[in-house]
Amino acid sequence: MDGYSSKKPRSASPSRSSLTEVEEEERDTLLKTVSLEEEDKSGENGPRKLRRSRFLYAIGILMLSNIAFIAAFLTVFVQKRALEPARLPPWAPPERYESRVFKYMDVYGGEPGPKSEEAWTNLIPKGKGWIKVHNETAIPDMPGLDQSLPEQSALVSVFHQLHCLYMTRAGYFAARSGNLDEVNVVHVSHCWDYLRQAIMCHSDTTLEWLHAPPDNFGSTGWGYEHQCRDYEAIFAFATEHRAGERQVIHG
């Protein structure tokens, strides 16, 4: 033996295991660096995303508010238009409404006399409810209407109805007095059916409540409020556009 150790000298290059450890350390360091960079980026994008979300939320709320406002406006507009009376041509009588409570008036329902005759006659305007309509405005092409004429005549129906009611009243009292020759049967027969159709046409739906016993025998109709057309306004219109000066309810 020469006295030297038999161990081999260490190689100057690192072993495979030591290389693996170094690589893992470098990889971990790199991953930590990348992770920190991503955290930094996410930290920068966080407020930006939050601001964008808030902006989109505000836009959505604004759009919904606008839609709700438009819907409410259209609803109110449609309801208002529905409540407004239809636009009438200049030659048409006014259609205004008012509340009226029905009550018995003896001057109309009682026996004939000078006072009652005056009261009934005063229900009719001068011209007996006949009006003049100029052809300067559009007039519907009714049967028998000559559109070539410069003006037309028309009878406002309510005054025709009042005339018919008066004629049936006059016929009743004439017959009760035994003066049957004063009753124009054809005229009265016409008036009965004309008034029937007029009443059914307007069909007043006011409810007349049954009274408590012992008055639960029916209804007089007195004391109930009705929605009525403004008769005074129609009377004034017929007077302004009257076709004549005669003021009578009969004939």
Curated annotation (Swiss-Prot):
PANTHER family cross-referenced by the UniProt entry: TAT PATHWAY SIGNAL SEQUENCE, YALI0B05434P
Family: Belongs to the ustYa family.
The protein's name: UstYa family oxidase phomYb
Positions occupied by motif HXXHC 2: 187-191
Gene that produces this protein: phomYb
Species whose genome carries this gene: Diaporthe leptostromiformis
Role summary: UstYa family oxidase; part of the gene cluster that mediates the biosynthesis of the phomopsins, a group of hexapeptide mycotoxins which infects lupins and causes lupinosis disease in livestock. Within the pathway, phomYb is probably involved in the construction of the macrocyclic structure of the phomopsins. The pathway starts with the processing of the precursor phomA by several endopeptidases including kexin proteases as well as the cluster-specific S41 family peptidase phomP1 and the oligopeptidase phomG to produce 10 identical copies of the hexapeptide Tyr-Val-Ile-Pro-Ile-Asp.
Main location: membrane
Pathway(s) this gene product operates in, as recorded in its UniProt entry: Mycotoxin biosynthesis
